[in-house]
Amino acid sequence: MNYLLLVSGLLSVWQPVFGSRCGESTIPFSLEILPSGHPVLGCARPTCFGWHPKGYQLPTTAKFSRLNRKLDGFLRDDSLFTYPFETDSSKIYKVQNSTCEPGFQSSKCDSKDQWVGGIEPETDAFQDVAYQCCTYAPLRESTDRNIATVSAGEIVIGGEVYQNESQYAFDYISNIEKSMDENGEVYYEVNIRRFACLDPHNADRRIDEVWSSENTIRKVNGQKPIAQQAPNVAVNAPIEAGTFDGEVVDGQTVVIEEIIAQQGFIVENETTVAPFAGPFQAQGFQPRFGAPQGFQPAFQQPPPQQFFPQNFQPVVQQPVQFPAQPVGYAPYAPAGWQLHYCFPADAEVNVYEKGVKRMDELEVGDWVQALHGKETTYSPVKYWLHRDPEQEAEFVEFLLENGESFTLTEKHLVFATDCQQNVKNLDDLNPTSTGKINIGECFFMAQPENASKFQKVQILDIQRVRKTGIYAPMTSLGHLLVNQIHTSCHSEIDHHLLQNSFFKHVLKLKNRISKYFWNEESNTEGNIGTSLNFLIEIFELIVPSKMISY
């Protein structure tokens, strides 16, 4: 009996030491899924969290295990010291550590004031996963960023967010849900949230975002807000948040550096970018297929106040050449088919570091400008729903009060509203079918003088035109700015995650069939093509009707 009591007592206080844990003084900021399907959790200590007022790190309780000779987590190589600070400072949180569950006991961490502090070790990539949730009160003021779908060989990265070289926020992993697709392949849906996070010794209140973050910290600390000291400054070019296909190298930890300037790029799973040196040291990262040309780990970096971002170098693939049809030939299309065509060839988009491009010049891998929430960001083109330079189609052309025009097909979805309606956040809007928009309503467009803001532009006239060339790009956000107008990538169906997942698998299947029967290599420039109308009809049968706009 005494022996059983002893065993029971030991079991009641025993805590497993295996699995990846960020502990209570670091923050989960990245999640990599190895080719084997096992997750790797990345933990970081930014300037706003995990510090003692005297300037040294709080005790690090992060722990990681090795499974099949691969580590299941890592600590980002952050600075060991910072400047001392006062506990009543308005630029840093009074509470500098989270409170974590004693073990891996949660199926998800879906409370607003939680993040995923640890992941239970997996001996089998197909087993259910348990998480250790950590609670941190300031997260109640956090905002939702997006949900990233991460599969084997992919990684999602958050981290510091910058505006004009001043840090104002940090993107973290709030929740992870493991799922399996119809092919039996495991993927993870990763929730990314953002909370105010300043470098207390390099915080310029003249910048809107820094001023707003300081007031958020003041609110959390129970202090009064401050008034802004100066008007807004100009917006600098953003630094991308890309993804890396890599795995944990034997005997090393993976350290992925991620700095996001301006309002940040939407993290993507398949667009690979060259790593760049940030204010933290990089160590040990080796992509699965070798490092990008010219990549050198940065072992000596300047302090955060000397941060100088490098230029974004996306990997761009060459576009597929589409042969022209013989003169007078009109390809067969089902009734109503051309209504799904989307944009004409002469529609224009802003591409990061490449300027303005016509739609017929756009390539998969280009990062195009988009309005997101209350701000402007960039989002990569993932694939083409349709791309046919020779196809003639009927478009709806809107003549606008600023003297410009905006053209797209009848069933394409676009964001419009009554001009008198007060809209503060574009994420609160639902897109409308082009054919249902009337004269006198307003579109949303990026301000010419300040692209980080949006304004309304009224429709003065509507007419029908015929043009040659139809283009339907799909971005990671599901929308983009076309002729500076905020518009969806979709036709009819207003559900980006479902539609994107559906067509992504269709494109993958099409490429496999092409390779099998015609020995054509798969490529991301390919498009769904003439099967799009049929596929949309199938999608309408399996998607709830309230998600479809008519």
Swiss-Prot record:
This is Warthog protein 8. Belongs to the hedgehog family. The record marks 412 as: Essential for auto-cleavage. One of its GO terms (molecular function) is peptidase activity. The keyword Hydrolase applies. The record marks 409 as: Involved in auto-cleavage. Residues 1-19 form the signal peptide. Pfam families: Hint. SUPFAM superfamilies: Hedgehog/intein (Hint) domain. The C-terminal domain displays an autoproteolysis activity. Intercellular signal essential for a variety of patterning events during development. One of its GO terms (biological process) is system development. InterPro entries: Dev_Signal_Hedgehog-like, Hedgehog, Hedgehog_Hint, Hint_dom_C, Hint_dom_N, Hint_dom_sf, Intein_N. PANTHER family: PROTEIN QUA-1-RELATED. Keywords: Autocatalytic cleavage, Cell membrane, Developmental protein, Hydrolase, Membrane, Protease, Secreted, Signal. The record marks 342-343 as: Cleavage. Gene3D superfamilies: Hedgehog/Intein (Hint) domain (2.170.16.10). GO terms for cellular component: cell surface; extracellular matrix; extracellular region; plasma membrane.
